[in-house]
Amino acid sequence: MNALIVKSALEYLELSTVVAILIIIACALLSYQISARRPLYYNLFVVEMHTWTTRRMVQVLHLGQEFTPPVTWERLVQRMRARAPRIQGEQRVAISDTNIVIQSPNTVIDSPAPARSPDVDLITLWDIEMPPPSAGHVPDATRDSQYAAAAAIAILARGDDASLMSRTYRPQLRPPTERSGNTRVDESRPSENSSRHDYVTTDVTYTTPSINPDMQHHLSTRTSNVTQTQPPTNQVFADTPELTEDIVIDQQEEDDEEDDDDDSSDDAIIEDHEEEEGQDDDEETEIEIDRGGPIEEIEQVEVEQNEDPPLDDQEVEAQPEQVLQETKESEFPVIEGPSEGKILIKLKFMNDTEKNTYASLEDTVAKFKVDHFTNLANQVIRLIYQGQLLREDHRTLEEYGLQPGSIVHCHISTTPYTRPGIATLPPIVNNGFRRRPRRSVRAPRDTTPMPSESVPVVDENVTTARRRAAQDRNVGQIYLLLSTMVPILSGIGLAFFRPDRIRDLLRPATLLTISQWVCNLLVDNGLLEQDDDDQETHLQTSTLFWIFGGQMVAVSIFLYYFPDVFDRVGFSIFIIVFLYFVFVVYSRQRRRQPDPVEVQNEMMENQIVQETIRLL
């Protein structure tokens, strides 16, 4: 029975239908992978603003997505307010609540929070410290809503991690002193007389970061669900529950020691006595820094260190010849100091020494050498910029592409430039062997003896030429590899657009052969329609047209109502599929029956194409 059903299905289903279904499934999977984002991706926040006499706290309840609480919203807000921090000795001025809905948080901030809707017992309640209200502050709903939105965005930036639990403690403030004029935080160690604040810890996991610019951040540690009383501290805020209390105490002791050092340095009087050389009378300058007052005058005297003594003649003769040559190169005087219309050019010698020179871009290479180098007798100065030898002295620096701050390598030797008329490089062939050039092509022999030091230059040029030849061969191989892919891609494209109608007979034989083979393969399998009057073929084409057209209409409607789901890649794929639908499926549906004259012309053109392929 099963075999009969399978056989019937195979007889009923056509290969084109199976291929179309597979393409649809592949497109659906690709679209899901590209746009794996929910169409309605948003986050719900309930924000409560608690305004106290000298403080302002914001409670943020991150509900996630599609939150359906089992309790009423009034009960939820009551539970939030019951878990608000209570401060002894202060009066709560006002409470305002705001509902925040942020759609597509990736457009607001790159949120590391997962897209989920947590249960009621796993919801994270955040307490955020806000800037305290100023004197005579009147509660403003607009400003409170702005604070609420900022708090919600801050939660998105931090991520939704329900395992965090921390506490923040408000430092004790003391009145401003005369020398600072600003409010300072008392960073002394806790004592029995220091003020203490009681905080109520509830059974809901929450964190208490601070975005108040006027208050210092604090270190957060794990606490238990017990009411705790903590003295003021001075630490840096960080969500690191692994830190222990010992580290907190050590950091507090280090801060106290730094404060003691700062107080002792403020009360000290600095006296500097500097002596200036080259003057008859020695002047002594005494600088006193009063407490909290500005420094009136500070004199800086640069002490120049004595340069190393020059080398003796015996030591110079003992050095190797190469080191001596590098020393001579670095001893060439270079004119330093900028002037009007000149740019900075850095000269780098072979011994890794650099000197700054200033020249105009309109100066020639010869003028640059004359201005910045002396003792040119029996010396050849080679300037190299970006791997290019500045050989032509009559060209300007601007023609060689020099810019302000360019680095020019300088090589000084006694080897002259190679003459253009002398063939110094043998021809390089693919087999790697050298071949002597013919005498008819060889340049006339020069009677001038070549110095012995020119051999390394020739070897260097030969190496460079071989390297360029190898690079050219690699480029040729890469081009050959890429050119082999062109007929395949072109053949696939021509198969869809009926290559039997091609009138251009000058195409390569390989391209036509492959395209014709692909076309015949697709026609034999029923993927392309032949020019016959078979009613079944027309029925299959009509069915494929209506299926494809309905899918394109559905995707277009979805794109119109949910444009946020599509990104650039998905939209590009949609455009490609739409163009294929218009130029292939729709045009095939509207294709009229050919006339007998056109059929005869097409047969003649096909015969001409086949004969041309055979001749090629």
Curated annotation (Swiss-Prot):
Ubiquitin-like domain residues: 343-417
UniProt xrefs under InterPro entries: TMUB1/2, Ubiquitin-like_dom, Ubiquitin-like_domsf
Skewed-composition ranges (Basic and acidic residues): 184-200
Organism: Caenorhabditis elegans
UniProt region (Disordered), positions on chain: 166-243, 272-298
Record-level GO BP terms: ERAD pathway
Disulfides per UniProt: none
Coiled-coil spans in chain: none
PANTHER family, per database record: PROTEIN C7ORF21, UBIQUITIN-LIKE DOMAIN-CONTAINING PROTEIN
Lineage: Eukaryota, Metazoa, Ecdysozoa, Nematoda, Chromadorea
Superkingdom in the source lineage: Eukaryota
Gene3D superfamilies: Phosphatidylinositol 3-kinase Catalytic Subunit, Chain A, domain 1
Protein name: Uncharacterized protein B0303.4
Residue ranges, compositional bias (Acidic residues): 272-287
Polar residues: compositionally biased ranges: 221-237
